[in-house]
């Protein structure tokens, strides 16, 4: 059973194939109409952590693919009342075709997947946010910033690629970890700038750097945001205090004071660089109002691409796991 728990579950060709499915589904949705590839299929959506974008994009996505989504908060299932993960996983997976889980500890997700009889998708865990990275890479492709990519929907692009430089500014959290994964797999240059004490996990960095030997990528961990942004094609940030870190909010504001992506910082990047943020954004903290609402910002295109990226992930998983699908003309 092939799950989608981290990007490292897939190789370069598989990631690009998944992105291609997402691109094709987006094209169909905008120009032809949605096709019911997953007609009659049921997606269980388990939210131990609440979300706006994750719920709306997955629920809309499975509907557009012809299936049905079932929303389950921690109040709706016995996991919130002490039932073992393995019991919940075996029961739910016996009644649905696919499961998306948004949780805290990544180990909970891994245990759930190990007992599930259907594919499990990581909607977010404390360590990784892989669905967001598929949406981010999809956005990069649409903006012409990516490695060699020969999708027929973009025939004038991908002729050798741009060998992009991505600068991630801020907390070494699940978003940083997933960017590290993607750089190791696809082979681009990633620079992460975080305050001392807030860098990404060392084991995740080491594994990705080992992968870069084959992929040709570069991963640099820095403490200077301007150095990271210098000549970058993509500038990314995230909230300084993630869900569950509210008590650290004031402490983190002080630590990250020099890591706000504002107009001055963006001036160090390429003139045609784009700005990405997975949202929600806190204006005046990790990003200025001017950057978030400016011409370089692709944040709302990126957010909308969550829908198409996750449709691509679901359909790709259904195909490789040989889930019986309805023939669509």
From Swiss-Prot:
Pfam families: OTCace, OTCace_N. It comes from the Bacteria. InterPro entries: Asp/Orn_carbamoyltranf_P-bd, Asp/Orn_carbamoylTrfase, Asp/Orn_carbamoylTrfase_sf, Asp_carbamoyltransf_Asp/Orn-bd, Orn/put_carbamltrans, OTCase_ArgI. Keywords: Amino-acid biosynthesis, Arginine biosynthesis, Cytoplasm, Transferase. Reversibly catalyzes the transfer of the carbamoyl group from carbamoyl phosphate (CP) to the N(epsilon) atom of ornithine (ORN) to produce L-citrulline. Transmembrane segments: none annotated. It is found in: Cytoplasm. Belongs to the aspartate/ornithine carbamoyltransferase superfamily. OTCase family. GO terms for biological process: arginine biosynthetic process via ornithine; arginine catabolic process to ornithine; citrulline biosynthetic process; L-arginine biosynthetic process. It catalyses: carbamoyl phosphate + L-ornithine = L-citrulline + phosphate + H(+). PANTHER family: ORNITHINE CARBAMOYLTRANSFERASE, MITOCHONDRIAL (PTHR45753), ORNITHINE TRANSCARBAMYLASE, MITOCHONDRIAL (PTHR45753:SF3). Carbamoyl phosphate binds at residues 51-54, 78, 102, 129-132, 278-279, 306. It comes from Helicobacter hepaticus (strain ATCC 51449 / 3B1). GO terms for cellular component: cytoplasm. GO terms for molecular function: amino acid binding; ornithine carbamoyltransferase activity. The keyword Amino-acid biosynthesis applies. L-ornithine binds at residues 174, 238, 242-243. Its EC number is 2.1.3.3. Gene3D superfamilies: Aspartate/ornithine carbamoyltransferase. Pathway: Amino-acid biosynthesis; L-arginine biosynthesis; L-arginine from L-ornithine and carbamoyl phosphate: step 1/3. This is Ornithine carbamoyltransferase.
């Amino acid at each position: 059973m092939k799950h989608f728990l981290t990007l490292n579950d897939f190789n370069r060709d598989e990631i690009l194939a998944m992105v291609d499915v997402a691109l094709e589904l987006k094209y169909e949705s905008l120009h032809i109409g949605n096709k019911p590839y997953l007609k009659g299929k049921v997606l269980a959506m388990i939210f131990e952590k609440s979300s706006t974008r994750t719920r709306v994009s997955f629920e809309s996505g499975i509907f557009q693919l012809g299936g049905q989504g079932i929303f389950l908060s921690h109040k709706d299932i016995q996991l919130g009342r002490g039932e073992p993960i393995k019991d919940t996983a075996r029961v739910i997976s016996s009644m649905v075709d696919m499961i998306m889980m948004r949780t805290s500890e990544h180990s909970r997700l891994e245990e759930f997947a190990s007992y599930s009889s259907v594919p499990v998708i990581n909607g977010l865990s404390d360590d990784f946010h892989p669905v967001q990275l598929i949406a981010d890479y999809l956005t990069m492709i649409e903006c012409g910033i990516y490695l060699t990519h020969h999708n027929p929907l973009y025939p004038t692009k991908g002729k050798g690629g741009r060998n992009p430089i991505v600068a991630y500014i801020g907390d070494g959290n699940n978003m940083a970890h997933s960017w590290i994964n993607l750089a190791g797999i696809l082979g681009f240059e990633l620079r992460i700038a975080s305050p001392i004490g807030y860098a990404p996990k060392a084991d995740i960095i080491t594994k990705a750097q080992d992968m870069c030997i084959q992929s040709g990528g570069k991963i640099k961990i820095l403490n200077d945001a301007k150095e990271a942004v210098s000549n970058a094609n993509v500038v990314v940030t995230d909230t300084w205090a993630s869900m569950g870190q509210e008590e650290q909010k004031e402490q983190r504001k002080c630590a990250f004071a020099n890591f706000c992506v504002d107009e001055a910082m963006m001036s160090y990047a390429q003139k045609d660089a784009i700005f990405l943020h997975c949202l929600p954004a806190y204006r005046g903290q990790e990003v200025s109002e001017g950057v978030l609402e400016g011409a370089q910002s692709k944040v709302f295109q990126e957010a909308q691409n969550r829908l198409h990226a996750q449709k691509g992930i679901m359909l790709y998983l259904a195909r490789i796991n040989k889930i019986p699908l309805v023939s669509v003309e």
